[in-house]
Amino acid sequence: MAQKHPSTSRSCASLRPNMESYILDELSARFGVGPSNGDPRSPHFSREGYLVASLFSKLPKSENTPEVRAQAALTKFLEADLRNARSNERLLFCEGYIHGKPISVILDRARSICASILGSGVDYRDVAMCGSFSGGASTSKKRGVSTAYFKFRELGDITERAMPYLERYVELTRYSELSDARGTLARVVPGNIFFTVPKNAETDRGACKEPDWNMFFQKGVGDYIRKRLKRVGCDLNDQTLNQRLARAGSIDGSLATIDLSAASDSNSISLIERIVPYELYAVLDDLRSPITRLPDGSDYTPNMFSSMGNGFTFELESLVFLSLTRAITSLFRVPGKVSVYGDDIIAPTDATPMLLDLLGYCGHRPNVDKSFTTGFFKESCGKHYFHGLDVTPVYVRRPLESRQNTFIQCRNRRGGAYTVKVPDRRRVIHLHNRLLHWGSLDGVVDPRLDGVIHELRSMIPEDFWGGRDVESIDAAVTPDLPRLRYHESFDRTDTSDEVVYLMCLNGSRTESTLVPKGAAFSEVATRRERKLCVSEITAGPGLLTSVTPRLQTRPNKTWLAKQ
């Protein structure tokens, strides 16, 4: 019988009582940084200080319960919509000036630019027919059963004004067969449903679950807008253009990076009507949700045109912001690059005073913490640069301890009992690997990270050492031998009608697999490979008669076959 391979890893890894405080204190001491070093606008800014200031900034605080964060997201959603109500009134008349230019003239130019991007002679009702279902949750289905299969197969939701689009879609496709069997096309609902997802330590992010068929047609229009934007150099499938421009702006200061606060919830109905050509606006207005159901069950009529969760919100806001930015640069004759990715805007530094005034008039507010119009620090699409150097920090977004077994009870040699926190292996591995990547810009790991790296590595069993991918959450990057994947192929060559049970002894655990006649069995071992020992391969009827290794490694497995 195979012997159990002794593990060299610690039997019980635990977290320090105040792991976050230890990491911050250790890094601050090793780097010699203080609070001022983490402020991008401070003359004492440094990459190391920025890491310390940002590392746990997105980790939810213990006193902020999920209910508190969800309520904060709802409050922010309603406050943004209150501003939309004022924007709707203001944009009806478009009175006032921005740096000597009438606002009405600027918005007319933006509308003209928007129309040129979209092209002419397009029937957007036909465009909506080219939609698709997403894998996200809807008003009728949870995320786990929200694939296209279930959304086509089961009865979906739709708003009343979007029903003509579904009727037309049924006429053009074979979906009519399924609808005839049901006797109805879809269930009519008033609108979408508000919900929240985790964002940072203070608040969640608000979004809305759209009716199934509304989302289907929304994505059709959104995909068309995305394709038209790509034709003019705004590729919403690629963030690297914004990132490259942000780096260029951090070198010479010629470009500004602007991030808008609650941008998806700040596109008022009047703004979209003022910027977007009527042919497209009419279709978008049919497909949007006119009513939002709040967590308390009440129905709310929003002043925003669409929210996050809508199938065309991202493309529509990109189109609007690109049109507004180009209107400013063309009317004020400011040269320079313009790029937009959602609410991340890159514009010439000289144009930012006028652009911010215009955005403010339209109901949008810049995120002060993430907008950099002066200086040499720039941030866009998740990348942060300072004088051309990548200073993007590492973020810990979830607690390092395991959620399933936060505490375990241990006993010391004297019989005393105590409890320790159990680390979440994947989160610890991810933090370990990301810190290694952050500290090795020149190919050599910063020795000042040694203390924290060794502390994190001590909480990772050695069976998960030897990784090579810094993005991995399953293997810690260490100098050890790589965690190779072992592949053995067992080919059955006899002609009997009997079946074969293949048993795998891995320590004290035994697994069995049924191998039918004429089939080949293969097993991939993902644990650290140790030793190859294939035993008791006995010839005879109904047995495996050949073993073909495909990769010569040292697996921590013992294989045997029996009748």
Give short role names for the model-derived ranges:
Residues 384-398:
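A polyampholytic, Gly/Pro-enriched intrinsically disordered region
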Residues 1-204, 421-563:
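C-terminal, non-catalytic extensions of nucleic-acid polymerases
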